[in-house]
Amino acid sequence: VEVWEDIKPFVEMVDEWSISQGGPRMTKFEVLTAMAYSCFADTPVDVVVAEVGMGGRWDATSVAHAEVAVVCPIGMDHMDYLGDTIEKIASEKAGIIKPTVGENTPHNPHGTVAVISHQDPAALHVLLEQAVDAQAVVAPPGSQG
């Protein structure tokens, strides 16, 4: 309840602006994600494992800049929102692979790491393009260290 009270004014502000532009209110997932990030800001943690919702590029979790992005097998899901081909869906989901922000850290001296599971070849091509654009190190399936 305390976290909700902390972020409620911001949720109301976003909702009012979105509605004034003809858009929707924040979704339950977006509000819960904001609440989680508020908790992490108030009580810093070393590591957060956050699962994206439907996609990666426009997902509520995309405001975080992860040192590691893990992409599980991509299938033909959420087609109404993400696209009607494996390439379009992969393009949306590839949005979690982002360039390193700021300095590399001792825990992550090489910048962003993209761990990509076994994929349809067309999806893999899209994910690898994004990894190159983000200058991410790609850890293929089965790699260690």
Describe the role of every protein-language-model region:
Residues V1-A64, M76-G83, K88, P121-A122:
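ATP-dependent carboxylate-amine ligase catalytic core
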Residues E67-V68, Y81-I96, T100-T105, T112-G145:
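Internal gly/pro-rich beta-alpha loop/helix module
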